[in-house]
Design a protein with these regions (language model features):
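Alpha-helical residues within the helix-turn-helix
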Residues: 53, 71-72
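Exposed, interaction-prone assembly regions rather than primary DNA-binding/catalytic cores
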Residues: 119-126
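N-terminal helix-turn-helix DNA-binding core of bacterial DNA-binding proteins
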Residues: 15-62, 89, 97
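Alpha-helical linker/hinge and terminal dimerization helices associated
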Residues: 35, 73, 102-117
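Basic, amphipathic "hinge/linker" alpha-helix immediately C-terminal to the N-terminal HTH DNA-binding motif
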Residues: 82-106
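Residues within the DNA-recognition helix of helix-turn-helix
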Residues: 66
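Long, low-complexity, charged/polar intrinsically disordered regions in eukaryotic proteins
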Residues: 1-11
Length: 126
């Protein structure tokens, strides 16, 4: 795995700064739809309709916006095949695969602590 060294200022890499590039990227990818898209793609290459079908509750518009954002940030690769009608496929890039590991750990954490969180919510509401 080849990681490119960030050449910007330390301020740009500081998540705590509201105007930093790191905060902008974090804000982009740390939303429920982006995380679910990353988990859904996994190590597969899928067409738009397959991703849409696999993620319950996501709208066509939200999937489009999030795939574009993930592509813009270099986490998803979009391939268009010159067929009629055009065939478009999506796959995670190397950095996207790296983030997938973190997303997968978050999914595992959620499953592991569901009971505890459900109980805490009950106490909070009750």
């Amino acid at each position: 795995m080849v990681t490119k060294q960030f050449s910007g200022s330390p301020d740009e890499a500081d998540l705590r700064r509201a105007d930093s590039l790191a905060r902008e990227i974090f804000s982009d990818v740390a939303n429920k739809w982006a995380l679910l898209i990353i988990e859904t793609l996994g190590d597969r290459t899928l067409r738009f309709s397959e991703v849409l079908k696999d993620i319950d509750g996501i709208s066509h518009k939200m999937l489009t916006q999030n795939l574009r954002m993930l592509e813009r940030n270099g986490l998803v690769e979009r391939t268009v095949y010159p067929t009629v009608p055009p065939r478009v496929e999506y796959t995670l890039t190397e950095p996207g695969q790296g983030l997938r590991g973190t997303v997968h750990l978050m999914c595992d954490w959620t499953q592991q602590h569901l009971g505890h969180i459900e109980e805490a919510r009950g106490r909070f509401s009750g």
